[in-house]
Amino acid sequence: MIDVKDLSENPDKFRASQRARGADESVVDAIISADAARRAALIRFENLRAEQNAFGKKVAQAKGEEKQALLAEVKVLAASVKAASAEADVAQAQQEELLRAIPNLIVDGVPEGGEDDYIVVKTVGEPREFPDFEPKDHLEIGELIGAIDMERGAKVSGSRFYFLRGVGARLEMALLQMAMEQAIDAGFIPMITPTLVRPETMQGTGFDVKHDAEIYRLAEDDLYLVGTSEVALAGYHADEILDLSAGPIRYAGQSSCYRREAGSHGKDTRGIIRVHQFNKVEMFIYTTVEEAAAEHERLLAWEEEMLAKCELPYRVIDTAAGDLGNSAARKFDCEAWVPTQGAYRELTSTSNCTTFQARRLNIRERVLNEDGAPKGTRAVATLNGTLATTRWIVAILEHHQNEDGSVNVPRALQKYLGGLEVLPVL
């Protein structure tokens, strides 16, 4: 949720953000109008209630016919107060509905446009060339080494499901363990998070549970399967006041994740690039508004550290405004080179959500004066970033393959695989 005071005082800034996203600018003026209506309704209610209180004192002092007349007026006034209160509640609800409809304000420097209008921040490493043999794709390799079974995944659960078995299961567990150890070394608190959350938690994180076709819902329980542990980690401190005096609070959550991929018909139907269920280690940070941009750079650096450990060529892109989720004010993606596709594919992303999620979830920090006396509270900033996920297996198998289909294990991963240096063909 955005700051309505900031929007009212700087509407052009929010209009520009909406334009950059390719979104409707008129919602800005609608929010300003709704806020004015809310304020007016609240003033009417408070004035009538003050008048009602004053009448109450008069009634207490009056006698006889005068008291009866005043009681009649009080009855009429009470009805007016009740109506004004209802009007104020309606105005408040209308404003909140509009506030929940507008995405986060983008930060300075985010490129305008849609999915293809990103900016390449940097490219690290060179895509591997295969002069001596034609590279196999990750699914063919996965079948040769007994790591991936799509056929039985479809038999058991349907399309876009799979089994990781043998070295495939071990490789994923190794990735997740290496990611979690790196996060712990960087000061993150490890978390195993729920994968089912309440609608208010999902909405508070910035997802539209009514219209988002990517979300699985358990209707009988009114619970939602998360597509990232970011959701549970964001809701962890809902309705709390945090102490950030010692620095940011950092969590690393590991969970299974679920996505319906409803808008992906016909895309990436082969292999495990786009699936309904996968595992992930997600970094999540609570910090001050002033420190958010620096934390975003740190998250990106930690993601790049993981990519370097896996010895993968990659690039970092600054995602265009129109391709940002509702909650993100800025997002960097790390994309690894996938040889058989001749393209970079996203492995990680990191988003600065500024105070958007915290306002929706009512997460604040205590603010002190220079003398240390309490000054009040304000919304914190939240950020997230992926450290490892099932999709990494795609890039690792393809980039490190040998002609026979075996795969060289990146040196940093070998200790998590019992010293295994090569994933052999069966």
Swiss-Prot record:
State the EC number(s).
6.1.1.11
The alphabetized UniProt keywords are: Aminoacyl-tRNA synthetase, ATP-binding, Cytoplasm, Ligase, Nucleotide-binding, Protein biosynthesis
Molecular function as annotated in GO: ATP binding; serine-tRNA ligase activity
Principal localization reads: cytoplasm
Location relative to the cell: Cytoplasm
Pfam families named among the record's database cross-references = Seryl_tRNA_N (PF02403), tRNA-synt_2b (PF00587)
A GO cellular component annotation here is: cytoplasm
User: What is a biological process (GO) this protein takes part in?
Assistant: seryl-tRNA aminoacylation
The residues that hold ATP are: 259-261, 275, 346-349
Q: Which reaction does it catalyse?
A: tRNA(Ser) + L-serine + ATP = L-seryl-tRNA(Ser) + AMP + diphosphate + H(+); tRNA(Sec) + L-serine + ATP = L-seryl-tRNA(Sec) + AMP + diphosphate + H(+)
Question: Is the keyword Nucleotide-binding in the record?
Answer: yes
Which InterPro entries did the record assign?
aa-tRNA-synt_IIb, aa-tRNA-synth_II, aa-tRNA-synth_II/BPL/LPL, Ser-tRNA-ligase_type_1, Ser-tRNA-synth_1_N, SerRS_1_N_sf, SerRS_core, tRNA-bd_arm
User: Superkingdom, according to UniProt?
Assistant: Bacteria
Bilayer-crossing regions: none
Which portions of this protein are annotated as coiled-coil regions? none
Class of this enzyme: ligase
- The residues that the entry says bind L-serine are 228-230, 282, 386
Which biological pathway?
Aminoacyl-tRNA biosynthesis; selenocysteinyl-tRNA(Sec) biosynthesis; L-seryl-tRNA(Sec) from L-serine and tRNA(Sec): step 1/1
- Whom does it interact with, and what assembly results? Homodimer. The tRNA molecule binds across the dimer.
The free-text domain remark for this protein reads:
Consists of two distinct domains, a catalytic core and a N-terminal extension that is involved in tRNA binding.
Q: What function does this protein fulfil?
A: Catalyzes the attachment of serine to tRNA(Ser). Is also able to aminoacylate tRNA(Sec) with serine, to form the misacylated tRNA L-seryl-tRNA(Sec), which will be further converted into selenocysteinyl-tRNA(Sec).
Q: What is this protein called?
A: Serine--tRNA ligase
**Organism annotation:** Arthrobacter sp. (strain FB24)
Taxonomic lineage is:
Bacteria, Bacillati, Actinomycetota, Actinomycetes, Micrococcales
